[in-house]
Every structure is written in C-alpha cells, then in structure tokens.
C-alpha cells in the first residue's frame, strides 16, 4: 500500500507541472473586440512571414516548365504575393493519414511553408497537434504516434459514419421517465455475480429503450451494438483472460484520471473531453504529460517553436462548434494568439495564454496560464469520440464490485462518479460534462453583448464537424484574412467512407446566408480530381477584396483504398504506408505534370486579377482555367 501511495505521489507531482496555474494579470486588456481587423500578433506574424517565404512561391513557379512564366510576371508576384490557406476536414485517423500525405506533397512542392494558415477540425486537428509537437517539420509527422496501440484501450473497431453519429443530436428529451430509465440502466448492479453477466444485463437494459427516443450523439446508441462485437455468440469463454484484459483497460483509464486530477484540484470543471485529450496525447510515443519540465500549452509550444519564431510556417487554427443554448453552426477558433469567434453574435477574442482566466465584463479578475492544453484543444475539436468514452465509462463502472468501487472512487473526485452520471439532477445550473466545458467563460457579461454566449459563465464546445460542417473553411474565408486561395482536403465519410461533396455544399449554403456566394458544382458526378471553385474575380459583398479561390480535393482511391472507418483506432505499418500515398495523389492529381503547371496559374490568379489591365493571362493559363475551373 505504501509503495502504491509513493507511485501515486510521484505521478501526481509530474502531472501537476502541466496543470493550469495562477499568474499576475497584465495591465493591457485580455479581450479584443474584432471589428474589421486581425489581432496585432497575427498581423505582425503574417507581415514577417511574407518577407520570409515569398521566394518559395517563386521557386515553385520557376520549376514549372510548361507554364513558362516571364521575369516580369515573377516581379508582379513578388510585389503582390498571393495568400494561401489549407483546410483539413474531419475523419479520424483516415483524415490524419490522408492529410499527412497531402501536406507532405505540398511540402515537396515548397507550398506548405509558403501557406499562411492551416485549419483543422476533428481528425484534421490531429495533424495540427502533430505539426506543433514536431516543430512544424512535415517530414517528421507521424514519427511520435503509436498507431498500432488502440487509441481508446478496450474499445473494438467499428464502422459508423460521422453522419450517423450526429443525425439526431438536436433532439431533446421530453419523457423524463424514459430518460430516468436510460440513465439508470444497470446502474444498481453491484453484486459480485458473474462479471460478464452484469455487462450483458447492462447492454440489455440499454437496448430496451425505443429506437425513436435515442439520441445518437449523446447516449449509448449506436454504441450498444458493440455488444455483438464484444460477445458475438452471447457466450463468455476465457473469463480469466478477459478479466485480465479488463484490468489493463481499467489501468489505462485510471491513468487518464490521474492526469486530469490536477486541473480539477485547481477548481476547473472536468468534462469527458479532458479524458479524451489525455487519451490522444497518450498515443504519442513521447508522453509529454510525464515530463515535469515540459508544458503542453498550445501557445507556449507554438511560440517556442524555432520555425514559428522565424515566421516560416503557416498559422495553425483549431476549429470547434459552440452548443450554448440552441446554437448550431456557430464556430470558435483557437490560434496560437487568441481564442474566440468571428460570428456576428460575438466577434470577441481572448489572448490564448490567458484562456481559463476569470474575466467579467471584459475585466480580468484572476489570471490563469496553461489552461490552453494542446491535448484538450485537440480533443475539443474532435469530440465526436466522446460518445465512445461515454460507452467505456458505462461499461467499466458497472463491472464487478471491486472494479466499480475503484473506478467510482476516482471518478467521484472529479464529480463524474456513478451517482453523477446515472442520476437526473434537478439543479439546472449543473454543467453538461459530455461537452467540452470552458469555464470561466472569458466573454461573460461582456458589455453590449447580451446573448447565450455571454450570459452564462461557461461555453460548451464540441467537435467542429458535429453540425455537419466537417471542413474548417469558414474560418479561412473571413475577409479579415484576405486569402486568395484555399486548398481544401475533404476526408468525410458520406458514401462508403468517401466524401461526395455534401459537406462542402452545406458550408456554401451557410456562407450564402452571410452574403458570401460560391456555386457548388452540381454537374460533377465524382470527386476524384481537384475542382477549382470561384475562379471568376468576384468581389465580396461590402468589401473591396476578391473572394478566395477554393481548390477542392476529395479523398478517393488513388491506387489504394482509403475509405477506412472514422472509428478505426489502430493502423499497422502496412496500412499507414498505403494511406500516405493516397494523400499525395489527391494533392498532385496523381502527379499530373500538366495540373502542377496549371497550379501555378491558379495560385497567382488573384494577383493578376488585382492588376488594372484586362489582358493579364497567358494562353496556357487561360486553357488551365478552362480545364479546371468550375463556373
């Protein structure tokens, strides 16, 4: 027992080093009202980056032997270089692996470091975390990931589309009796009878709930079907081995609890997303949580990166959705500089290092650092996996009396014990911990902003793709960023785990409501090649700048099938080796030399559009626009 307490004490000392802590508040305001400008730090970074990387584009253009650009053309581009963004969709490891190949090919062309922004959500956000961990060295991506170990220990692989997960997410519970039954399903099982019989009883109680009443995102359906995977024949053979496996699973989740505890001890609300964040970080071979001298703060990691300090890499942007009230498709973003939203309902930002501070009416009362944990932010953007964690907690906490007591004791410390999870609270102020909880809300009671984002002292954030907006495009399209071209990689699972363009269409419909008009290519049957949208020099409504050109790339079979399930949580080396070339093929159009040359025309089109003279493009570029631009 003493040895166990000693180990616990040592581990707790280590993880406390990464917990949020109080600091002295700065004299300058922490909240910025976003009127029509970027924050000063972002503006300065882009100004320095333009000087640092503009020659990379010239090098790429000079490598294009068919386009034959002139020296006069190069001078124009150097004088007014295009601004480029990258948007990586969700899709679990599928998105991360295809996306890694995608930006690796960009890097080979010299276009990755030239780009100004890279935005990711859900599985795409894992690429951003990897980039930050690897000091933005594209060639080092995936080296720290242990892809052969289960991402969530104890959960088998299954194939459910993101669309199926979020289909009924907006439904509300109206039947309290049914709700009570759902939450109490199996929760009173505490006897020491056969362990697997208890699990079976729990699963049966879950399946008794009428299908029409189930909320797929926020309860155990469709995860109840995993019973068939755990127990395909309804038989429980090899009990000793299974109990040993379960102990391993339990140890895994206990370790997550231990790493989350310091945040709770500092008085912060804990949610399932905290555990999910630690689970993601544990899949890194170098466990940063075990290094007492290493902060995993997003702002600190990025701003200590050599390449980022040199202003030679794109700014990473994590995207999440807000669920306060009945909001939908209200997006928030995390950059290394600030956190907030460009949505008209808010347009406020807080300096990222001070996220977690108590700020009321725009004035700082207690300042915190280290709340911006990179794992937590990544998990927030990819919290569609929360339902998997909910499943494992229900499975584990209803096991044998000994295991249940051990787990319930640890969970109770965080306010996530059996009683809290399975009971109906009459306290309306109680927070929904299956969302990512950001409390204190930095925008609480902000003057002249009385709405659901400011009248509560918490923000609920969820997977960036939960409302069907699975591509982080809108955060890049805003006029303040003045982008000319956006590379989009869509690895959504619309049909057979391949995208069909529906996510892009949904975003265009949302943009249309904001007077930002793109025409969706309805006459395109398949999305196996890049499609260039918005080539025509269309100016924004109410602005003097042009809308950015969107180069849409869809994950497709480029010699290797890449339609693995979003919830496939292990990949062996052979599988990884087959996915990465797909991403390269998607970006390069299967290494098509003509397309590569045309890319030079497309990337510089807005630069030429801004020239006053009408005759601007070479015959070669005009043919490229005809071949690839959708109008």
Curated annotation (Swiss-Prot):
The listed outcome for residue 122 to A is: Loss of function
Q: How does it sit in the membrane?
A: Single-pass membrane protein
Induction comment = Induced early in sporulation. Not detected during vegetative growth.
- One Gene Ontology cellular component annotation? fungal-type vacuole
Q: What is its main location?
A: endoplasmic reticulum
For this chain, the Swiss-Prot or TrEMBL PTM comment says:
Glycosylated.
Specify the PLA2c domain's residue ranges. Answer: 24-631
Sugar attachment sites are: 233, 293, 303, 500, 536, 560, 563, 572
Which stretches are transmembrane?
Answer: 376-396
According to its UniProt record, where is this protein located? Answer: Endoplasmic reticulum membrane; Nucleus membrane
* UniProt keyword list: Endoplasmic reticulum, Glycoprotein, Hydrolase, Lipid degradation, Lipid metabolism, Meiosis, Membrane, Nucleus, Signal, Sporulation, Transmembrane, Transmembrane helix
GO function terms (MF aspect): phospholipase A2 activity; phospholipase activity
- The region called Required for lipid-binding and function in meiosis is annotated at 24-67
Spell out the SUPFAM superfamilies in the cross-references.
Answer: FabD/lysophospholipase-like (SSF52151)
Keyword Transport set for record: no
GO BP: ascospore-type prospore membrane formation; glycerophospholipid catabolic process; meiosis I; spindle pole body duplication; spore membrane bending pathway
Q: Its biological function?
A: Regulates spindle pole duplication in meiosis I, but not in mitosis. Required for meiosis I, meiosis II chromosome segregation and spore formation. Binds phosphatidylinositol (4)P mono- and polyphosphates.
Q: Which family does it belong to?
A: Belongs to the lysophospholipase family.
The protein's assembly and partners: Interacts with SPO23.
Protein's recorded name: Putative meiotic phospholipase SPO1
Q: What is the lineage of its organism?
A: Eukaryota, Fungi, Dikarya, Ascomycota, Saccharomycotina
